[in-house]
Amino acid sequence: MNYIVMRGGRGASSSYGGDRNTGGTGKPMKFYDKTKSFQGMTKHEFENAIRDKTVEYIGVFNDKGELLVAGTSYSPNAVGVPTNHPRWNEVHDLTHNHPYKPANEPNRTIGATFSTADVENHLALDIKGETRAVSNGPNENTYIFRAKAGAKQNKNAFLKHSQKSEGVWNRDSTKKVKEVEKRLAKQGKTLSPAQRNQIVYGTAKHSWKSKAVTRAGYEYIEVKKSHW
């Protein structure tokens, strides 16, 4: 049975949301089914429809490219994963947006790449195809990771790489911000919140580019200029 909880202005939340979300909090989130709004779209059409959203949306597709379910939790930080949908067992690809100008972070200009939560979900939910994240910040469009064809996948190594990437991101972004602030101070200038934010999230993209991904049997793809 699909229990419904009414929410003024948002329509009804469905029972599709399971015990996982894209934010990695380990807590279920209300899932608002928006499949009808995107019905009939290809994966790339759906991604172009959500990349400018200020809250996270998610869509899952089967191996024939059919949209199974799409929706949102109306949060700029995460969206519930609809693992309770009756056709979840057909899921092949999972895509979602990383808001680059969310209401809770007015100075954020980059959606940024994957978090450890994205990798954990991909592995725990046994996504057979791709996990994708889309945004529309400067020089970014689509981030993709997937198992490398013909390679043996080492899930533990892949997860460790993502965790290490977050550590490198935090360390290097702090260092980079300080370097830029010091250089600007000599010129009598300051770093704006938007510029600081761009440095922080830009560093995240670089931390993912490592041979460790390939050694673990996966591919990481960053599409900068064309919307796939």
Describe the function of each predicted region.
Residues 1-22:
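Short turn/helix-capping motifs enriched in Asx and small/polar residues
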Residues 16-27, 78-228:
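Active-site-proximal loop/helix of nucleotide/amide-processing enzymes and allied scaffolds
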Residues 19-21, 53-57:
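A domain-level signal for caspase-like cysteine endopeptidase catalytic cores
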Residues 29-52:
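Beta-lactamase-like hydrolase cores
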Residues 47-52, 59-60, 84-85:
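Short secondary-structure boundary/capping segments within folded domains
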Residues 56-63, 130-136:
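Short beta-strand scaffold segments in enzyme catalytic cores
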Residues 65-66, 140:
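Detector for glycine-centered tight turns/loop "hinges" at secondary-structure junctions
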Residues 69-79:
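Structured interaction and signal-relay segments at domain junctions
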